[in-house]
Amino acid sequence: MDLNSNHKSSVLKDPSPSVNQSRLGVSSRFMMSQWKKPAKLDDVRSNGWLDAMISSSPPRKKLVKDFNVEVAPEDDFAQRAWMVKYPSAISSFAHIAAQAKKKKIAVFLDYDGTLSPIVDDPDRAIMSDAMRSAVKDVASYFPTAIISGRSRDKVYQLVGLTELYYAGSHGMDIMTSSDGPNCFKSTDQQGKEVNLFQPAREFIPVIDEVFRTLVEKMKDIKGAKVENHKFCASVHYRNVDEKDWPIIAQRVHDHLKQYPRLRLTHGRKVLEVRPVIDWNKGRAVEFLLESLGLSNKDDLLPIYIGDDTTDEDAFKVLRDGNRGFGILVSSIPKESNAFYSLRDPSEVKKFLKTLVKWAKLEKNSTGF
């Protein structure tokens, strides 16, 4: 990759107050305005966190091929209306292909729920060999990146394809071949020298501190799982009895009052602790496109496929930029910045294979 030298590192939206930096382990350029003390009475309810946790509970499950997915009834009116607004990327492929003709395509993919099924144990979210083959074929035609909430090392270990670009921790840890001014050299798990872009690097000590404390705070809650993704920490409650959800939310919420430079976000059956910086999956897409020398191309067509709320930032970047489109992976109706939809990972695989088949035909017809 060639990284343009004028790329700016992430910045905070608000000015920085004076705080104990040794306690936080971060530099002043990543500080935000003073934390506003939340309401004392029933914090998690007043802030809507418990409602958000409950709303993420799936309607019902059924087995679709090799995937355990959330399913809404086919004859449900809301589902049909939703499909009109977010049509299937497979059924709409002719329209997508027409837009893609003579364009430079770049493909961005989430991992969990997109390339692998959502499962009770995150460690068992294994990508099938057929899906890996489909992704590898896509990467042989188009620049392809995985942007995951998992740590970069973990998602690389799960995918195992050297042809791809990897961004972990929701884009806060990007491995690149560029040696631009905002990147630094490191060594990967294979001992190879790589260049990394980590806009939240100063937060590593405080995230580790929060992770270790949350592990202790969740020990007595059956089914709770805490993970350290290096630049963010997550508390999974998919296997927790619903009566214990308020306890989890309250403990996490209360503990974070000590860390005004961290924020709490919500995903699919997971609470995530993240640095308060102006960076997300959408910014990661912009960075990768710039790194690839594609950001100012008029003939660019990025495609982003993801299933989580964190993918909405990437969908919005593509929609607001009026180029490319997002594809939401969901079998239940929900509002999104995406243009198209796919029901589950099996349909993602089918779409990727269709994209490769189209690319082969285009190559044969043009001779390039």
Curated annotation (Swiss-Prot):
Q: What is its EC number?
A: 3.1.3.12
Mind telling me which InterPro entries this protein's record contains? HAD-like_sf (IPR036412), HAD-SF_hydro_IIB (IPR006379), HAD_sf (IPR023214), OTSB-like (IPR044651), Trehalose_PPase (IPR003337)
Gene induction: By trehalose.
Top-level EC class: hydrolase
For this UniProt record, give its keywords in alphabetical order, as a comma-separated list: Hydrolase, Stress response
Pathway recorded for this protein: Glycan biosynthesis; trehalose biosynthesis
Does Hydrolase count among this protein's keywords? yes
List cofactor names only: a divalent metal cation
Which segments carry the region annotation Disordered? 1-23
Q: Which reaction does it catalyse?
A: alpha,alpha-trehalose 6-phosphate + H2O = alpha,alpha-trehalose + phosphate
Any one biological process term the GO annotation gives:
trehalose biosynthetic process
Q: Spell out the Pfam families in the cross-references.
A: Trehalose_PPase (PF02358)
Q: Which CDD domains match?
A: HAD_TPP (cd01627)
Q: Which GO terms describe its molecular function?
A: trehalose-phosphatase activity
What functional role does this protein have? Removes the phosphate from trehalose 6-phosphate to produce free trehalose. Trehalose accumulation in plant may improve abiotic stress tolerance. Participates in the regulation of trehalose metabolism.
Q: Which family does it belong to?
A: Belongs to the trehalose phosphatase family.
PANTHER family cross-referenced by the UniProt entry: TREHALOSE 6-PHOSPHATE PHOSPHATASE, TREHALOSE-PHOSPHATE PHOSPHATASE F-RELATED
Q: What is this protein called?
A: Probable trehalose-phosphate phosphatase F
Species? Arabidopsis thaliana
Lineage of this protein's species?
Eukaryota, Viridiplantae, Streptophyta, Embryophyta, Tracheophyta
